[in-house]
Amino acid sequence: MKFLSLLLLVGVAQAIVPPREPRPPTGGGKKLLTYKECVPRATLAPRSTSLAWINSDEDGQYISQSDDGALILQNIVTNTNKTLVAADKVPKGFYDYWIKPDLTAVLWATNYTKQYRHSYFANYFILDIEKGSLTPLAEDQSGDIQYAQWNPVDNSIAYVRGNDLYVWNSGKTKRITENGGPDTFNGVPDWVYEEEIFGDRFALWFSPDGEYLAYLRFNETGVPTYTVPYYKNKQKIAPAYPRELEIRYPKVSAKNPTVQFHLLNLASSEETSIPVTAFPEDDLIIGEVAWLSSGHDSVAFRAFNRVQDTEKIVNVKVGSKESKVIRERDGTDGWIDNLLSMSYIGKVNGKEYYVDISDASGWAHLYLYPVDGGKEIALTKGEWEVTAILKVDTKSKLIYFTSTKFHSTTRHVYSVSYDTKVMTPLVNDREAAYYSASFSAKGGYYILSYQGPNVPYQELYSVKDKKKPIKTITSNDALIEKLKDYKLPKITFFEIKLPSGESLNVMQRLPPNFNPFKKYPVLFTPYGGPGAQEVSQAWKALDFKAYITSDPELEYVTWTVDNRGTGFKGRKFRSTVTKRLGFLEPQDQVFAAKEILKNRWADKDHVGMWGWSYGGFLTAKTMETDSGVFTFGMSTAPVSDFRLYDSMYTERYMKTVELNADGYSETAVHKTDGFKNLKGHYLIQHGTGDDNVHFQNSAVLSNTLMNGGVTPDRLTTQWFTDSDHGVRYDNDSTFQYKQLTKMVYDQKQPRPQTTPLHQWSKRVLAALFGEEAEE
């Protein structure tokens, strides 16, 4: 909501003309992409518009922000707009805002300070729209409030400060908990729950009628601490002693934070702890909380065992505070993903249901489940997957969702009636494309976002007329005009079949002036992690990968291959990597490399790989195979040993060390012959301030390679002082991409037939090549 455009509902409804062709753009001009246009971020990029739909009595209202900063209330039905908050009432430098449901107040976040990937600290202020007065949420706040949220019904706000829960109501604040501190979190997740379970910064949920609040309490007592040093700490002159950030970070088989489920009666402030007996305390993860009623009768939570291959849905009856398991599943053939997809439906044929996504059939599909337990009702089926629930419209008895029905690399928007089970596409689902949609509060309108493979656009529709848009929200016509001057890399998508029968999705970029009679170096660019997807029909940024394909001095062909274990091709395809990360994935990349080398234009002497995070790990494991196919590699922020990574991610796929000791030993990068035998070079890059994949991984990897005899002409390790997992501190990203570019340039050059001998290298060369060493 931080970057909103003013949308004026004027003029005649217009669709995108001409329609986008179902392929990535190639340009049509003569200009080639330059380094400055692509690195470190793409400057030739599509824009998108975010809308804040308003949940009011009248559907089709949303908030946008004008050029002068004012908040504008737009009404699709009446084709009007009005100023809700004048520009001079908007706090300077605000980070985010939330409109009170009755449109009488705005909650502003200011003085933003980033914490982890999703979380931040801020000051919060309440603007009374009618009076124009601005009131601090807490009088003594000092940029230390962790989270705040409006009650969906009344004038109250739940917020978290110092890991304690508070409720503000019409100017009066009540402290709900008093045990918050460094090891106890109320209503907000700790690091590992934020990063690996919720993917968000809150752990509290108002009931639909606003009368109750469900929240989680996390206790990190006994969870080991990892210390991240900050050598510069954003100071001009480095402090003599680095600042040390201590994070409770559970690694594999270490103690996890414990979690408790609580209910708060907002009228009486009565707080109740609900016993969780689904799993023992030290074997419990709560992955999702959802209200299963239109009021506050029932609330459910999704419980997993520690290694996330067993799931139990627990329903709590708020009145009696009694709970029972209403659904459970054994997923020990792999793991069970936490899709955060439970949503209350209401009564169907006299029985209350909720909708959820499950891949128990082997493919992720929509099911209705009885709130009180019982047999599910399948709403979708087939060898394709539902990827997200977009909206539940209980009035029309429709569920809107995205799926891979056309192909695993595509996304199309559909509705399914939970009354008739009839499935209807909202878009042309017979061509390769990638769509999503954002629905108004009551489901009468939606913004359809075409996200690729061609230049993205957004259109506004009524659900009553899915063929003709009300208007185009974002056309990106200016970008299309600019791209007409360019000759862009040619992107194609295809599949290659493994000897075992599975097919792998591949995305190929060819240089703009590709000549099949020339030789071209090749760079593989995988991510390859469990359940992930890189090869999709979504828009491909004109970034570093596009640049190295375009530059006449480089002209790399790039291949991105989604190996076994990646997502959206069914449970069996995903689960095959269980307990053996880094085993099948490099085999698939090597197989793909052998396939590309069947092309006469592929230069077998210059085949590299670059990956980030899991992709960096996969790059290292692929070099480790000593296949003779890859000649160089580049790993950015790699995991090198999953015993060094967090428990909730790793154990989902690898289980615990006690259950899989040999698997962990094999998963770690530990063999060095493949690195020693590279014709080219191996580069490691890592930020020392990485709180996710710790710098420890690259430190250990470098040590392993050096002790294993990898020579300086084969290995470079580059650290980035205080940079996090995204390498964003100071000018680090600029240096990083210059280094990567120099690497791919150097690695495509002809290699000398003989290596010069020096006093410092004779013994090493003798060991490598069997030559007699001189004393």
Swiss-Prot record:
Transmembrane segments: none annotated. One of its GO terms (cellular component) is extracellular region. Its main location: secreted. InterPro entries: AB_hydrolase_fold, Pept_S9_AS, Peptidase_S9_cat, Peptidase_S9B_N, Serine_Prot_S9B/DPPIV. The active site is at S613, D690, H725. Its EC number is 3.4.14.5. Gene3D superfamilies: alpha/beta hydrolase, Dipeptidylpeptidase IV, N-terminal domain. Glycans are attached at N81, N111, N219, N731. Pfam families: DPPIV_N, Peptidase_S9. It is found in: Secreted. Residues 1-15 form the signal peptide. It is an enzyme of class 3 (hydrolase). It comes from the Eukaryota. GO terms for molecular function: aminopeptidase activity; dipeptidyl-peptidase activity; serine-type endopeptidase activity. GO terms for biological process: proteolysis. Keywords: Aminopeptidase, Glycoprotein, Hydrolase, Protease, Secreted, Serine protease, Signal, Virulence. It catalyses: Release of an N-terminal dipeptide, Xaa-Yaa-|-Zaa-, from a polypeptide, preferentially when Yaa is Pro, provided Zaa is neither Pro nor hydroxyproline. Extracellular dipeptidyl-peptidase which removes N-terminal dipeptides sequentially from polypeptides having unsubstituted N-termini provided that the penultimate residue is proline. Contributes to pathogenicity. Belongs to the peptidase S9B family. This is Dipeptidyl peptidase 4. It comes from Arthroderma otae (strain ATCC MYA-4605 / CBS 113480) (Microsporum canis). The lineage of its organism: Eukaryota, Fungi, Dikarya, Ascomycota, Pezizomycotina.
